[in-house]
């Protein structure tokens, strides 16, 4: 019984982290799906989302506002707006001018953008950890008083619920809306979409904006969950989310969701049963294995040219 | 409507197209024929903005279009298909037709999210147009299939339907009958004629299937080794000695 409770605890922790990985991974996978580049500055967009949320929360506290739902909504909206604008600007400034050039050029441009944003936040906000108020506290406990108890915190429930809502909206948007339809068309054949009169530049911008908005949501959630942020906050999370995207099949949106969850669970199981030190080894080990044996990922489809 | 004047296209040392001229009038089907490698598709690529020609002029409705980017040309109403099928193969048949009307819908993101009456009305209109063209090319039953799973002949017809929902003035078809069986070719034959008769679209096509070309073309241009060889009505072309030589080789 105790073993089962312990297992369930790891599963809950894993799914919590995993769903935020999935939120960030969407940004990688959509951008890759549409213009075939890895946006290495995406982790920084997520970090900036977390900082913006923190600034908004601090500002509201200074104004003496204490009503939690209002604080959360304002923080979320601010983070989404700032991150989306950043995502849009990064594409406009660093990627669009080099689009269509050799594949390495946008990649290097992305790495440059990532370093720039990281250092910008270093300068503007200082390089030390800043505490992030928990805001949502408490939770449920299961199991006997005197032995191991499985707990699920309200924060974790918030993370699940928010992720679920975001993913549902995204899926509906992609499958039903006019812009979602155009996104799919552009990702399949950019040249043809252009010929048919779709403004492909706008669609590409939209992809960056959507990915950045979801990353901002993850930034707020993980900031609260971990309790502190620093300018390097986006780097590892970005790499993890990238791994999740590759694991699920880069370019595939359901793949990013699945990859995030699998990666989160794998990590928490490693920390729970082996050692926390090994969790990065396992996640990047998974990345290597998937690249070796199934380079298209779990849900990615190999491109077959019909002749 | 369309006038190509002394078009030349040079790739390094190779003069792929040399002083080709042709014109397409309103309400007309014009064919471009010639042996393999004659430069037909290169002419097409110049006309549709895929290549920037190295010499000559292309006038569409009186305006020069040579060297303009392809999407600008297509927005003027000059749409093309390619030798190989280029559908959005992982989207459904009807989605292929809806996405082609993206520009015509001209709505913004907000009205989509709020699902305003105006947005719904425009969506409904494009859906109606898609349904009309699906019926027209006989693919209504396939509307919700993935385009990539259709038979080859159906994919070809869907491509033409996708061009037509954009309401073009001039349709350029690059080997539309390639890979079709005789029955399918006959259907295509009728479809192209009806585009001209019923929808007032001019058509330029490249085709190797001579029966198709002779049946439907109002005029034919023959190109050989990048140079114009002959032009005229199907009857004139059929009797032209130069054309016969080029196709059969000199005895």
Predicted regions and their residues:
Chain A
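Transmembrane helix-bundle core of multi-pass membrane transporters
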Residues: 97-98, 106-176, 203-206, 269, ...
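Helix-loop-helix "hairpin" substructures at the membrane interface of multi-pass membrane proteins
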Residues: 148-229, 253-258
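Inter-helical junctions in multi-pass inner-membrane proteins, predominant
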Residues: 2-20, 127, 152, 173-178, ...
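Membrane-embedded helix boundary and interhelical linker motif in transport proteins
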Residues: 34-37, 41-89, 93, 149
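Short, non-helical or kinked segments that cap or interrupt transmembrane helices
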Residues: 19, 28-51, 100-105, 179-182, ...
């Amino acid at each position: 019984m105790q073993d089962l409770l312990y297992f369930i605890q790891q599963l809950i922790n894993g799914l919590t982290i995993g769903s935020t990985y999935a939120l960030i991974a969407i940004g990688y996978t959509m951008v890759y799906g549409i213009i075939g580049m890895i946006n290495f500055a995406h982790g920084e967009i997520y970090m900036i989302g977390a900082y913006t949320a923190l600034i908004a929360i601090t500002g509201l506290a200074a104004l003496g506002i204490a009503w939690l739902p209002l604080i959360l909504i304002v923080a979320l909206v601010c983070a989404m707006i700032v991150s989306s604008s950043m995502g849009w600007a990064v594409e406009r400034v660093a990627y669009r001018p080099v689009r269509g050039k050799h594949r390495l050029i946008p990649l290097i441009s992305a790495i440059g953008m990532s370093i720039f944003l990281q250092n910008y936040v270093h300068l503007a906000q200082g390089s030390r950890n800043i505490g992030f108020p928990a805001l949502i506290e408490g939770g449920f406990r299961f199991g006997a008083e005197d032995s191991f108890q499985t707990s699920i915190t309200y924060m974790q429930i918030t993370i699940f619920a928010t992720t679920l809502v975001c993913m549902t909206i995204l899926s509906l948007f992609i499958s039903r809306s006019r812009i979602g339809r155009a996104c799919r068309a552009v990702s399949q054949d950019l040249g043809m979409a252009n010929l048919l009169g779709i403004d492909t530049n706008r669609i590409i911008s939209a992809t960056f904006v959507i990915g950045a908005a979801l990353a901002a949501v993850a930034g707020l959630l993980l900031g609260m969950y971990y309790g502190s942020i620093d300018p390097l906050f986006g780097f590892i999370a970005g790499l993890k989310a990238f791994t999740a995207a590759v694991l699920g099949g880069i370019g595939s949106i359901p793949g990013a969701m699945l990859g995030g969850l699998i990666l989160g669970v794998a990590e928490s199981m490693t920390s729970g049963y082996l050692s926390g030190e090994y969790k990065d080894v396992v996640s990047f080990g998974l990345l290597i294995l998937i690249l070796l044996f199934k380079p298209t990922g779990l849900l990615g489809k190999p491109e077959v040219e019909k002749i | 409507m369309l006038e190509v004047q002394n078009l030349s296209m040079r790739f390094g040392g190779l003069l792929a197209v040399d002083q080709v001229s042709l014109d397409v009038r309103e309400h007309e089907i014009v064919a471009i024929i010639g042996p393999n490698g004659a430069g037909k598709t290169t002419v097409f690529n110049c006309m549709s903005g895929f290549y920037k020609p190295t010499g000559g002029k292309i006038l569409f409705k009186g305006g020069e279009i040579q060297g303009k980017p392809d999407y600008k040309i297509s927005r003027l109403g000059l749409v093309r298909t390619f030798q190989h099928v280029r559908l959005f193969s992982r989207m459904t048949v009807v989605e292929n037709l809806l996405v082609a009307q993206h520009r015509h819908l001209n709505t913004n993101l907000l009205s989509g999210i709020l699902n305003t009456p105006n947005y719904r009305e425009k969506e409904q209109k494009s859906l109606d147009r898609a349904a009309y063209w699906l019926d027209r090319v006989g693919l209504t039953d396939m509307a919700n299939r993935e385009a990539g799973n259709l038979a080859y002949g159906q994919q070809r017809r869907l491509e033409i339907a996708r061009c037509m929902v954009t309401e073009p003035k001039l349709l350029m078809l690059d080997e539309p009958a390639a890979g079709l069986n005789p029955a399918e070719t006959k259907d295509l034959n009728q479809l192209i004629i009806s585009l001209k008769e019923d929808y007032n679209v001019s058509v330029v096509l490249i085709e190797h299937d001579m029966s198709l070309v002779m049946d439907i073309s109002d005029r034919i241009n023959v190109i050989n080794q990048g140079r114009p060889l002959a032009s005229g009505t199907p009857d004139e072309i059929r009797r032209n000695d130069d054309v016969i030589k080029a196709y059969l080789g000199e005895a």
